[in-house]
């Protein structure tokens, strides 16, 4: 079964928003608890048939649902569903179960996108070597008095040898492409791969990823302990995510950190045996 929903988003719909707002104001929540990470989770249910029908009709008019988190789970569910449709005994579940996966859907204006930051090994380079090679790659470098997240696109914060630096891609050749022009792509193509040897960030053991919700000090802690250098990135906009999807392209790996994050196990989609 599924214990964690795929995270979907859509362009705001006024009908759906009004019903959700009314439900939260007029009804008592079904669940209201605080998880182990001190995050509060509140869940309301909608049982009014008129509201449910209005939501269903509104979603029929929405052209696209965009995957914010759960691309691999969606692809896996699709493959399982195709096998079941072809009569393949790929699992012990009924055809209807296998052809569906669990999803949580949020309007785009209800999401908070945070930076998905990098911390990595220095690849045998000294601090001076790293600074020199980053400058040669076309970045300006400014020392900061304290750690801070970037405030604009094509700007990065780097923590190295207990010092924070602001990097700006001033002389970097940025392609006119919705994916290649993302900050995460600029950093990967011009810094992480050529300087640190990170060719595939999904599988390389010398890099790890830290959501901005954990704070700037977590990047310091990692670089001062099991890693050597950390990079903080400016968040990708929801508009960029939708533009990339509409263009038929795929977001780079580990490029977005979305909130709210539903706690795993809050919703279950069980597969029933044949």
Language-model-detected regions and their locations in the chain:
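Surface-exposed, charge/polar-rich loops and edge strands
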Residues: 1-274
